Curated annotation (Swiss-Prot):
Gene Ontology MF annotations: DNA binding; structural constituent of chromatin
UniProt KW keywords: DNA recombination, DNA-binding, Transcription, Transcription regulation, Translation regulation
Similarity-based family: Belongs to the bacterial histone-like protein family.
Gene3D superfamilies assigned to the protein according to its UniProt record, in alphabetical order: IHF-like DNA-binding proteins (4.10.520.10)
Protein role: This protein is one of the two subunits of integration host factor, a specific DNA-binding protein that functions in genetic recombination as well as in transcriptional and translational control.
Name recorded for this polypeptide: Integration host factor subunit beta
One Pfam family from the record: Bac_DNA_binding
Gene Ontology biological process: DNA recombination; regulation of DNA-templated transcription; regulation of translation
Lineage: Bacteria, Pseudomonadati, Pseudomonadota, Alphaproteobacteria, Hyphomicrobiales
Taxonomic superkingdom: Bacteria
Self-association state and partner proteins as the record states: Heterodimer of an alpha and a beta chain.
Amino acid sequence: MIKSELVQIIASRNPHLFQRDVVNIVGAVFDEITNALAEGNRVELRGFGAFSVKNRPARSGRNPRTGETVDVEEKWVPFFKTGKKLRDRLNGAV
């Protein structure tokens, strides 16, 4: 599913909302999650999961095409940990 499909589903389930309003709401939610992560904060959505950032330290890597050793810089990456309700639903529990 892509963002536009999510917007269409939410708009169809909420006919009292205009699609442009749903686009703005979904965009605002994603923006706030992104802003919180950029500030180093954790975003927890109970029952769904938690977004956080983790540090990947610098390391030596290898170019698969040439075999040459390259230095990979330290970086921060997004991380998602599923919540219990989501995990249970995916595994068939009710």
